[in-house]
Swiss-Prot record:
Gene responsible for this protein: Ncoa3
Region (Acetyltransferase): 786-962
Gene Ontology MF terms in the entry: chromatin binding; disordered domain specific binding; DNA-binding transcription activator activity, RNA polymerase II-specific; histone acetyltransferase activity; nuclear androgen receptor binding; nuclear estrogen receptor binding; nuclear receptor binding; peroxisome proliferator activated receptor binding
Descriptive protein name: Nuclear receptor coactivator 3
Organism encoding this protein: Rattus norvegicus (Rat)
Region (Disordered): 138-219, 237-317, 330-374, 405-429, 455-485, 507-543, 592-617, 644-663, 691-717, 981-1004
Domain remark from Swiss-Prot or TrEMBL: Contains three Leu-Xaa-Xaa-Leu-Leu (LXXLL) motifs. Motifs 1 and 2 are essential for the association with nuclear receptors, and constitute the RID domain (Receptor-interacting domain).
SUPFAM superfamilies per record: Nuclear receptor coactivator interlocking domain, PYP-like sensor domain (PAS domain)
Protein's UniProt keywords contain Cytoplasm: yes
Biased composition (Basic and acidic residues): 293-302
Length: 1082
């Protein structure tokens, strides 16, 4: 009845005196509205009179309009007009799509992502659910709207839960029926039912939301629906969900991102509510919880009491979940519950469901809201773990609770349950608590089962980065991850830490994805569907395991810290997943896991520049995907939008992509870079000096912080210093704040619970490893740098290939410098580093170091300072000669001198450069002002004409040497490459253009100016004045279009600003650029 009622209600759009749209408009304007009585007939011929009354639901706290609570009054005419108010709160599309909203005070279910529907009133929902489901006291109806609203609900929608949403169907409705109901509800066709798991599902998250609500609303119905999903409906839906994930990520993700975040927060309480309401229809909370709780319950019920026992089991599961939530984290329990319930639901419901669930749960929105969902789930998980630990629950207890809450689906509860179990082993000590947190986080992608189940769906989705595979891949990757994690967890804390790093990465795949909504959009731009969502998943799946391998097996990759950094980059990575999926990327990440993670994050922006540099073909993609990761963009213009984002993965994948994308010479370059591994990081970094900026300071953290700045998580780096290993940077501003809160909580928790916890975490995260790895990396890089520096300096011809590699090594040099101020940072190595990216490598690192120094981690700060000191000394020696010349002949010195000078200035003349930079920033702003109008006009030229200046700007922003780089790109690439200005220039213009366009370098630029005023001044000095002057000389000489310093700035800003919306930032890059990246990513 309710389903038909809703269908009828939503079908009354044309030729009616009223329509649901008009009805809701009226409700939105007047706060309430009611429809005339309308009739419809049931399958049995019963005539039902219905009237829908909707009230505008406002957030009691913010008084924001969140959605509509629609009450449908139904009367069976046969039965004598007995009004049977089956109050079905149907989530209607709320005016405020993204507003989070707590529908029910008790449920605290927010109408996050109410973009599709508002959440029904909890009380109404409960009534409705009860009426519909035999007074099952399900407030699930409410949830549907919310679920619907939040990205998580989008994701959750995809689950059986959504199908069983009471609003969508009557208690007896099967998942399919409910889905049908959902479809109308979703403002979509009946196919919506299936759609909820399809890409449309994300779009139709409203229906999904409703499904969430219904899931527990009608315990048995919901469970049956879930079971049906798991048995078959779910499978098809899930398989579709894999697809929808990308779509969700593409479209809703943007909308849902914040809601998702709110949803996560809401979810936590909703989850608790959900548990409490288990009898009532925990679904309400779960819906906001992304349905994972409901899914979990369903899963439990489905798995434990597949059929009849579902109701009891459901309530039982709910109780357990409630235990988990209330005990472990009433607010944060949701995350764990969401993850594990989702996981469980996915597992039990169906592989298909699992896939979405896994994605949703482990990927935390990998499907519908890859980034926001995953980030939220991670945050939730963090909260859960934190809360569990805070509440004094031992890891064993947490594991037990989680396992119980999850029911038989221990693997299902992998994120919470298995993680808890693993933590159980670790319960003896706080270290184990940390391990628990890490493991839970790691397990956050409880794709163990999901991966297994999803893998079938994915059909080797890990390898394939098919869109559907997107959700599947993450599961698959996650599955691997969980396995690795589980083994590692059981292994030891170090393994856990490695896992944690990896987990953080995977977690932050989602979170980053979340944070990189532009990335999501980019995914939409360039096959984001297949790439974007699925990418994040694959990245997650591939990367986390890789990270683990990296952290465990490849200390060079900075241990788990790099993974964490990578996680930081993961926000980009979610778009990078394809890259991440690439073995190369893994290899590259192995070496540059952390380095690239950070740089790549910036790279994601710069990669476009790279793309431009590597090929204008990419540039076109880059233009529209400037946000996309430059490395990816470079690797593949077509992937630029979606993939470029995966900056982290990009470093490795960038090369692979380059391999594929780059013309012969570029593949060679890639090979060179890959040969030096540094190139991997370099692959990204070279593309955007900004990346080096991120990388050099401290690849793992500095880079991360730098990247975060660009990604709008600049403030995160500080928190991250201690907790960033555990927690990746949030993708969203909200995610960031949320993540920051989480990080703060985790930090407090770890700090309070264990004074040495942070040190342990550092050790676990591989900070010591970072140093040792820095040494290993340094030796490695030393070889590479020595080789590449020599190649760079000696083989100007190979400059392009070597330039980037040289840059890469410098970056790595910066990294290893950062990791240790080893002799490896020999003059040559550093010169190569600083020569190719003296300022970039050093500057960025300096900037990065500053952020790191800001962070509590003295070890890293000291390490960075030490390395920087050595770098400065070496670079100073190298640049000393140049230094004298570069100030005067900034334009003339261009390549080597200026690079060195820029480097020298950046390090030795930071103050001077700051002043100059301020002056030049103004100039640049003026130029930007001039260029902003021209961004579109200049955008294409920047590819070619402006690209030199762009590259210079990017590189320049990354380092004072950038100015030389601008014009003599060789300079940008290496001090030892001044002879190759024309060549470098030729190559780098596209890169410059792309970088500028991407804005990552600008981000980096912004960041280092931010992080390192010295950087700014040196940059500004070398770049604005030198650059502008050079623009006058080089652009004029080299590129007529850029004869103007203003033109150059304009070009630079155009490409970066127009593409990344960083035009404003470009002028600010020097002064306020840091905000540019944040704004850009926010």
């Amino acid at each position: 009845i309710i389903r038909r009622c809703i269908q009828r209600f939503f079908s009354l759009n044309d030729g009616q005196s009223w329509s649901q749209k008009r009805h809701y408009q009226e409700a939105y304007i007047h706060g309430h509205a009611e429809t005339p009585v309308y009739r419809f007939s049931l399958a049995d011929g019963t005539i039902v009179s219905a009237q829908t009354k909707s009230k505008l639901f406002r957030n009691p706290v913010t008084n924001d309009r969140h959605g509509f609570v629609s009450t449908h009054f139904l009367q069976r005419e046969q039965n004598g007009c007995r009004p049977n108010p089956i109050l079905q709160d149907k989530g209607i599309r709320p005016p405020a799509a993204g507003c989070g909203m707590s529908l029910s005070p008790s449920q605290s279910v927010q109408m996050l992502g109410s973009r599709t529907y508002g959440v029904a009133d909890p009380s109404n929902t409960g009534q409705m659910a009860g009426a519909r489901y035999g007074a099952s006291s399900s407030v699930a109806s409410l949830t549907p709207g919310q679920s619907l609203q939040s990205p998580s609900s989008y994701q959750s929608n995809s689950y059986g839960l959504n199908m069983s949403s009471p609003p969508h169907g009557s208690p007896g409705l099967g998942p399919n029926q409910q889905n049908i109901m959902i479809s109308p509800r979703n403002r979509g066709s009946p196919k919506m039912a299936s759609h909820q798991f399809s890409p449309a599902a994300g779009v139709h998250s409203p229906m999904g939301s409703s499904g969430n609500t219904g899931s527990h609303s009608f315990s048995s119905s919901s469970l049956s629906a879930l079971q049906a999903i798991s048995e078959g409906v779910g499978t098809s839906l899930l398989s579709t969900l894999s697809s929808p994930g990308p779509k969700l990520d593409n479209s809703p993700n943007m909308n849902i991102n914040q809601p998702s975040k709110a949803s996560s927060q809401d979810s936590k309480s909703p989850l608790g509510l959900y548990c409490e309401q288990n009898p009532v229809e925990s679904s309400v909370c779960p819906s906001n919880s992304r349905d994972p709780p409901v899914t979990k319950e369903n899963k439990e019920n489905s798995g434990e009491a597949s059929e009849t026992p579902r109701g009891p089991l459901e309530s039982k599961g709910h109780k357990k979940l409630l235990q988990l939530l209330t005990c472990s984290s009433d607010d944060r329990g949701h995350s764990s519950l969401t993850n594990s319930p989702l996981d469980s639901n996915c597992k039990d419901s169906s592989i298909s469901v699992t896939s979405p669930s896994g994605v949703s749960s482990s990927t935390s929105g990998a499907v519908s809201s890859t980034s926001n969902m995953h980030g939220s789930l991670l945050q939730e998980k963090h909260r859960i773990l934190h809360k569990l630990l805070q509440n004094g629950n031992s890891p064993a207890e947490v594991a037990k609770i989680t396992a119980e809450a999850t029911g038989k689906d221990t693997s299902s509860t992998a994120s919470g349950g298995e993680g808890s179990v693993x933590q159980e082993q670790l319960s003896p000590x706080k270290k184990e608590n940390n391990a628990l947190l890490r493991y839970l986080l790691d397990r956050d992608d409880p794709s163990d089962v999901l991966a297994k189940e999803l893998q079938p769906q994915a059909d080797g989705g890990d390898s394939k980065l098919s869109q559907c595979s997107c959700x599947t891949n993450p599961s698959s990757g996650q599955e691997k991850d969980p396995k690795i994690k589980t083994e590692e967890v059981s292994g030891d804390l170090d393994n856990l830490d490695a896992i944690l790093g990896d987990l953080t990465s995977s977690d932050f795949y989602n979170s980053p994805t979340n944070g990189s909504h532009p990335g999501a959009k980019q995914q939409m731009f360039a096959g984001p569907s297949s790439l974007g969502l699925r990418s994040p998943q694959p990245v997650q799946s591939v990367r986390p395991p890789y990270n683990r391998a990296l952290s465990l097996d490849s200390p060079v990759s900075v241990g788990s810290v790099p993974p964490v950094k990578n996680v930081s980059a993961f926000p980009v990575l979610p778009k990078q997943p394809i890259l991440a999926g690439n073995p190369r990327m893994m290899d590259s990440q192995e070496n540059y896991g952390a380095n690239m993670g950070g740089p790549n994050r910036n790279v994601p922006v710069n990669p476009t520049s790279s793309s431009g540099d590597w090929g204008l073909a990419n540039s076109r993609a880059s233009r529209m995907e400037p946000l996309a990761s430059s490395p990816l963009g470079r690797a593949g213009g077509d992937y630029s939008a979606a993939l470029p984002r995966p900056a982290l993965g990009s470093s490795g994948p960038t090369l692979p992509l380059r391999s594929n994308r780059l013309p012969g010479a570029r593949p060679t370059l890639m090979l060179q870079m890959r040969a030096g591994e540094v190139p991997m990081g370099m692959g990204v970094s070279p593309y955007s000096p900004a990346v080096p900026s991120n990388q050099p300071g401290s690849w793992p953290e500095g880079m991360l912080s730098m990247e975060q700045g660009p990604h709008g998580a600049q403030n995160r780096p500080l928190l991250r210093n201690s907790l960033d290993e555990l927690l990746g940077p949030p993708s969203n501003p909200e995610g960031q704040s949320d993540e920051r809160a989480l990080l703060d909580q985790l930090h407090t928790l770890l700090s309070n619970t264990d004074a040495t916890g942070l040190e342990e975490i550092d050790r676990a995260l591989g900070i010591p490893e970072l140093v040792s790895q820095g040494q290993a990396l340094e030796s490695k890089q030393d070889v590479f740098q020595g080789q590449e520096a020599a190649v760079m300096m000696d083989q100007k011809a190979a400059l392009y290939g070597q330039t980037y590699p040289a840059q890469g090594p410098p970056l790595q040099g910066g990294f290893h410098l950062q990791g240790q101020s080893p002799s490896l940072n020999s003059m040559m190595s550093q010169i190569s580093q600083q020569g190719s990216f003296p300022l970039q490598g050093l500057h960025p690192r300096a900037s990065m170091v500053r952020p790191r120094t800001n962070t509590p981690k003295q070890l890293r700060m000291q390490l960075q300072q030490r390395l920087q000191g050595q770098q400065f000394l070496n670079q100073s020696r190298q640049a000393l000669e140049m230094k004298m010349e570069s100030p005067t002949g900034a334009a003339v010195m261009r390549p080597m001198l200026q690079s060195q000078q820029a480097f020298f200035n950046a390090q030795m003349a930071a103050q001077q450069k700051r002043e100059l930079m301020n002056h030049h920033l103004q100039q640049q702003r003026m130029a930007m002002m001039m260029s902003q109008p021209q961004p579109q006009a200049f955008s294409p030229p920047p590819n070619v004409t402006a690209s030199p200046s762009m590259d210079g700007v990017l590189a320049g922003s990354a380092m004072p040497q950038a100015p030389p780089q601008q014009f003599p790109y060789a300079t940008n690439y290496g001090m030892g490459q001044p002879p190759e200005p024309a060549f470098g220039r030729g190559s780098s213009p596209p890169s410059a253009m792309m970088s500028s366009r991407m804005g990552p370098s600008q981000n980096a630029m912004v960041q280092h100016p931010q992080t390192a005023p010295m950087y700014q001044s040196s940059e500004m000095k070398g770049w604005p004045s030198g650059n502008l002057a050079r623009n006058g000389s080089f652009p004029q000489q080299q590129f007529a279009p850029q004869a103007n310093p203003a033109a150059y700035n304009m070009v630079h800003m155009n490409s970066s600003g127009s593409h990344l919306g960083q035009m404003t930032m470009t002028p600010m890059p020097m002064s306020g650029m840091p905000m540019g990246p944040d704004q850009k990513y926010c």
